[in-house]
């Protein structure tokens, strides 16, 4: 974990991005499946 000063570690970027993508997809599919997506 050397030479990471002033930069965001790639593993942190990947983890946050993956979590956000999965969360957004989960909310989208859950809303569409439960019928809430059609009312938005």
From Swiss-Prot:
Chief location bin: plastid
GO-annotated biological processes: photosynthesis
Keywords: Chloroplast, Membrane, Photosynthesis, Photosystem II, Plastid, Reaction center, Thylakoid, Transmembrane, Transmembrane helix
Domain of life per record: Eukaryota
Transmembrane spans: 8-28
Subcellular location: Plastid, Chloroplast thylakoid membrane
InterPro entries xref list: PSII_PsbJ, PSII_PsbJ_sf
Record's bilayer topology term: Single-pass membrane protein
GO cellular component, one term: chloroplast thylakoid membrane
Keyword Nuclease: no
Family per similarity comment: Belongs to the PsbJ family.
Protein name: Photosystem II reaction center protein J
Origin organism lineage: Eukaryota, Viridiplantae, Streptophyta, Embryophyta, Tracheophyta
